[in-house]
Structures are given as structure tokens and as C-alpha cells.
A protein has these predicted regions:
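Extended, low-hydrophobicity, polar/charged segments
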Residues: 1-160
């Protein structure tokens, strides 16, 4: 089970006790926000994009953010193309709805969008479509082994 793999991975950071599992789906931002009891913007959604270099990249962003094609192209040099559900599972080891930056192969680069920085804590998935993990942005950056903070989103508001 993917959530067990994530729990074991987060143990090395002392964060395994932050995982919450639910009896209801957390596969969408709205479902996760309801289950966790926070505004949707605090859900850190993980999107999987095609990469000619390594097959896949992960970008985590606030639940209210949307990818800005121009910003994405400026950052990565290509138009953003989401992976299929099958490819997302193949590259990350997590099924869509539970995709997260934890316990993914080292070859998969992870980036964090600045839309997350306005919150003290955020809630990415933890490997299943019925889980979440509460992390500060610093903890998320460290545990995801992020390659850094980027600005590729639009539609979010700084003061939420």
C-alpha cells in the first residue's frame, strides 16, 4: 500500500505521525479540504507533468492555484502536459488522487510553487486517495527533496 511506503519514508524525517487516513476520499482538493477541515487553498496538490529529460516532474501548488502556461513555459522551456493516470502511477509509484512527492524515485524532480508559501501549514496527499499529511512549508521542502521554489501558477490570492 502506497501510504505505508510514504509513512516509512517520512519516518526518516520524523514526520510519520503527521499522516492522517480517512474513511472518505481525499482525491480532489475539495474532498481533501472537507476531510482535513481546512480551506481548499491549504491543500497542496501534486501535479505530474511530462518531461523529455526525465519522463516526469512533480509540481506542488496551493489548492486554489492553476498552472499558468506562460510561466510554466518560461521556467521549463516547454508547454505543460499532464501525465495520464497510468503514467503518473508508473513514474511516481502513487495512483492519481494520492500522488505526493514522498517515496518517489530519485529521478523524479520535485518543485514547489510559491502559492504554498502564504500558509504556515499545508496538506499534501500521503500516497493514497484517503490520506493527507500536515507539514510546514520548510518540512515539505525538506521531505520532498524539492529542487526549489518556483512561480508557475495563477489564480491564487496572496492574502488568504
Amino acid at each position: 500500500m502506497s501510504v505505508d511506503k510514504v509513512r516509512e519514508y517520512l519516518r526518516s524525517y520524523g514526520l510519520e505521525d503527521r499522516i492522517k487516513e480517512f474513511d472518505i476520499s481525499t482525491a480532489t482538493v475539495a474532498e481533501a479540504a472537507e476531510a482535513v477541515g481546512v480551506i481548499p487553498a491549504r491543500i497542496a496538490k501534486t501535479l505530474t507533468f511530462q518531461s523529455e529529460e526525465c519522463g516526469c516532474i512533480l509540481v506542488l501548488m496551493a489548492g486554489d492555484a492553476k498552472v499558468d502556461n506562460k510561466k510554466y513555459r518560461a521556467r521549463f522551456g516547454v508547454k505543460p502536459h499532464m501525465l495520464t493516470h497510468e503514467d503518473a502511477l508508473q513514474y511516481t509509484g502513487h495512483a492519481v488522487g494520492g500522488v505526493c512527492p514522498f517515496a518517489v524515485p530519485d529521478s523524479v524532480p520535485v518543485y514547489l510553487d510559491v502559492s504554498l508559501k502564504r500558509f504556515d501549514t499545508v496538506f499534501p496527499a500521503a500516497g493514497s486517495a484517503a490520506s493527507a499529511v500536515r507539514l510546514t512549508c520548510d518540512e515539505l521542502e525538506r521531505a520532498s527533496r524539492s529542487r526549489g521554489w518556483i512561480d508557475v501558477c495563477k489564480g491564487w490570492e496572496e492574502d488568504q
